[in-house]
């Protein structure tokens, strides 16, 4: 009898396919600050978070609260940081986009005012403020796309720490396995034609070939719905 294929097993939600979110340290957001005020704090620690590729910093603010933030390059323990309209334009400080000069690298940009930050948060990435108008600010994203934001959306000055991560090779399959395991990603990924006949519709045979058409109906049952799903055409154009 055939076994469940990986996509079916993943849908069941066993621990193998569930992210270990109980190990994740914190949800990184900008601190809540009134529009006209500024909040100061001190970096008291820099830590690794299994949930992300960049290091995170614990900041103790003057209002008595402690919070993890996205840490830019050049920030160290004991550094003084500020968040608000009157904060100095320097790496680590958080300001509204309306107060940031053009050409400055920024990270952890809010999608809408006070949502905590949504864009440019991965290690080594940054966006650049291109131009400013009365009702919108234009930012060049890490992908090169130009995106419009509300002037009251906040961003952190600087480039996210941990740059060069993708340039360093894993060297061992075991290290890649543990990296993918922290994200609940299945690794290594075996192609269907390399599997046994009980594991995949394309498995089995004396050589690597699907053995049947790779196009499949949109209404095919889950164990058969692999390959080119409801494809209008296949092959090179």
UniProtKB/Swiss-Prot annotation:
Which InterPro entries did the record assign? NA-bd_OB-fold (IPR012340), Rib_uL2_dom2 (IPR014722), Ribosomal_uL2 (IPR002171), Ribosomal_uL2_arc_euk (IPR023672), Ribosomal_uL2_C (IPR022669), Ribosomal_uL2_dom3 (IPR014726), Ribosomal_uL2_RNA-bd_dom (IPR022666), Translation_prot_SH3-like_sf (IPR008991)
Identify the GO cellular component terms for this protein: cytosolic large ribosomal subunit
* Keywords from the named record: Ribonucleoprotein, Ribosomal protein, RNA-binding, rRNA-binding
One Gene Ontology term from the biological process aspect of the record: cytoplasmic translation
Q: Which residue intervals make up region (Disordered)?
A: 202-237
Single GO MF annotation:
rRNA binding
Which Pfam family, giving just one, matches this sequence? Ribosomal_L2_C
Q: Where does the record place Basic residues bias?
A: 225-237
Q: By its UniProt entry, which SUPFAM superfamilies does this protein fall under?
A: Nucleic acid-binding proteins, Translation proteins SH3-like domain
Keyword Nucleotide-binding assigned to the entry: answer is: no
Q: Does the keyword S-adenosyl-L-methionine apply?
A: no
Q: Describe its assembly.
A: Part of the 50S ribosomal subunit. Forms a bridge to the 30S subunit in the 70S ribosome.
HAMAP family associated with the record: Ribosomal_uL2_A
Q: Which NCBIfam families match?
A: PRK09612.1 (NF007180)
Question: Which function does this protein serve?
Answer: One of the primary rRNA binding proteins. Required for association of the 30S and 50S subunits to form the 70S ribosome, for tRNA binding and peptide bond formation. It has been suggested to have peptidyltransferase activity; this is somewhat controversial. Makes several contacts with the 16S rRNA in the 70S ribosome.
What is the protein named? Large ribosomal subunit protein uL2
Q: Which organism is it from?
A: Methanococcoides burtonii (strain DSM 6242 / NBRC 107633 / OCM 468 / ACE-M)
């Amino acid at each position: 009898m055939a076994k469940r294929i990986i996509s079916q097993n993943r849908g069941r939600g066993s621990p193998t396919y569930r992210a270990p979110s109980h190990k994740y340290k914190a949800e990184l957001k900008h601190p809540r600050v009134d529009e006209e005020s500024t909040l100061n704090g001190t970096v008291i620690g820099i830590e690794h978070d299994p949930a992300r590729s960049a290091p995170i910093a614990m900041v103790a603010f003057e209002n008595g609260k402690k919070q993890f933030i996205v840490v830019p390059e050049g920030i160290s323990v004991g550094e003084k940081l500020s968040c608000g309209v009157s904060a100095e334009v320097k790496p680590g400080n958080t300001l509204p986009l309306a107060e940031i000069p053009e050409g400055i690298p920024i990270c952890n940009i809010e999608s809408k005012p006070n949502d905590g930050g949504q864009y440019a948060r991965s290690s080594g990435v940054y966006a650049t403020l291109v131009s400013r108008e009365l009702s919108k600010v234009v930012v060049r994203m890490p992908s090169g796309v130009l995106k419009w934001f509300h002037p009251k959306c906040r961003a952190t000055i600087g480039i996210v720490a941990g740059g060069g991560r993708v340039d360093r090779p894993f060297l061992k399959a075991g290290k890649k396995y543990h990296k993918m395991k922290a994200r609940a990603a299945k690794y290594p990924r075996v192609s269907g034609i390399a599997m046994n006949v009980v594991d995949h519709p394309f498995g089995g045979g004396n050589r690597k070939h699907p053995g049947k058409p790779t196009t499949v109906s949109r209404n095919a049952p889950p164990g058969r719905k692999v390959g080119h799903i409801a494809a209008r055409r296949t092959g090179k154009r």
